[in-house]
């Protein structure tokens, strides 16, 4: 899957998202995918070739590089973006199933009054409610879990988010404790912090969207409960009308009894 296909796929699901979800997609592709494709690959393109150690012992440089960088930053970022975008597949499958069922009912004549034709069903925006609400919130929850998990993996693999200028390596077959040097460590540290910051922003947006959906459901249920407790409008008007009729009737009887016979 290339990045264009991923953009088309997630962008299609974005039609049915909330406003916060649309902001999340923008941050994902502008500040993460574009940076990864345009700039980060250029910065990390020479990572293994320019990793130098002050020894000529065969195999020492490769072993030290594998020890300090077991997984390439770019490959781990790409894997993170794929995992974070994958939960949108749940929403896409749910929407596709909803449209398939709507089209089937339309052909049977059950929803002729709701849709003009089959194209109208495809253009309709599916509201986030009912079973789709559970699917959508589940996808957001998995996004948050994946973001947090990959941030921890980054910190665990590289002992933090800062790339040092000099690395001390004493692993076999190195003859002793040797110094190893990374190409452009400051530039790579800046990119690492930027990508981690973008990941934090995306995770906060996911948390905000999840809270928004939960509060929206709570407000909707509270409003529904108040509506069920309150008397209907026509019954309230009828009771008020009966009270007015009783008052008028009592006033008329009092006026009649007040005259002498």
Curated annotation (Swiss-Prot):
It is found in: Cell membrane; Cell junction, Gap junction. GO terms for biological process: cell-cell signaling; ear morphogenesis; gap junction assembly; gap junction-mediated intercellular transport; sensory perception of sound. GO terms for cellular component: actin filament; connexin complex. It is a multi-pass membrane protein. Residues 46-75, 155-192 are extracellular. The chain crosses the membrane at residues 23-45, 76-98, 132-154, 193-215. Residues 1-22, 99-131, 216-261 are cytoplasmic. Gene3D superfamilies: Gap junction channel protein cysteine-rich domain. It comes from the Eukaryota. Keywords: Cell junction, Cell membrane, Gap junction, Hearing, Membrane, Transmembrane, Transmembrane helix. One of its GO terms (molecular function) is gap junction channel activity involved in cell communication by electrical coupling. The keyword Transmembrane helix applies. InterPro entries: Connexin (IPR000500), Connexin_CCC (IPR019570), Connexin_CS (IPR017990), Connexin_N (IPR013092), Connexin_N_sf (IPR038359). The keyword Chloroplast does not apply. A connexon is composed of a hexamer of connexins. Interacts with CNST. Belongs to the connexin family. Beta-type (group I) subfamily. One gap junction consists of a cluster of closely packed pairs of transmembrane channels, the connexons, through which materials of low MW diffuse from one cell to a neighboring cell. This is Gap junction beta-6 protein. The gene is GJB6.
């Amino acid at each position: 899957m290339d990045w264009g296909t991923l953009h088309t796929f997630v962008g299609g699901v974005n039609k049915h998202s909330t406003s916060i979800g649309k902001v999340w997609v923008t941050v994902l592709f502008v500040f993460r995918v574009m940076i990864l494709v345009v700039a980060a690959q250029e910065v990390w393109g020479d990572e293994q070739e320019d990793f130098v150690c002050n020894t000529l012992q065969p195999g020492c440089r490769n072993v030290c590089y594998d020890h300090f960088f077991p997984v390439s930053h770019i490959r781990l970022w790409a894997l993170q973006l794929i995992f974070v975008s994958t939960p949108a597949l749940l929403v896409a499958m749910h929407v596709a199933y909803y449209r398939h069922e709507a089209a089937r009912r339309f052909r049977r004549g059950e929803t002729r009054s709701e849709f003009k034709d089959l194209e109208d069903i495809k253009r309709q925006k599916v509201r986030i409610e009912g079973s789709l609400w559970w699917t959508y919130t589940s996808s957001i929850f998995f996004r948050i879990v994946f973001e947090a998990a990959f941030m921890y993996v980054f910190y665990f693999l590289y002992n933090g988010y800062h790339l040092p200028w000099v690395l001390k390596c004493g692993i076999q077959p190195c003859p002793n404790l040797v110094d190893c040097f990374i190409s452009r460590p400051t530039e790579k540290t800046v990119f690492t912090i930027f990508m981690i910051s973008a990941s934090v922003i995306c995770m906060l947006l996911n948390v905000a969207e999840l809270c928004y959906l939960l509060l929206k459901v709570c407000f909707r249920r509270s409003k529904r409960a108040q509506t069920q407790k309150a008397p209907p409008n026509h019954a309230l008007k009828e009771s008020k009308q009966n009270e007015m009729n009783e008052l008028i009737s009592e006033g008329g009887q009092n006026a009649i009894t007040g005259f002498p016979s």
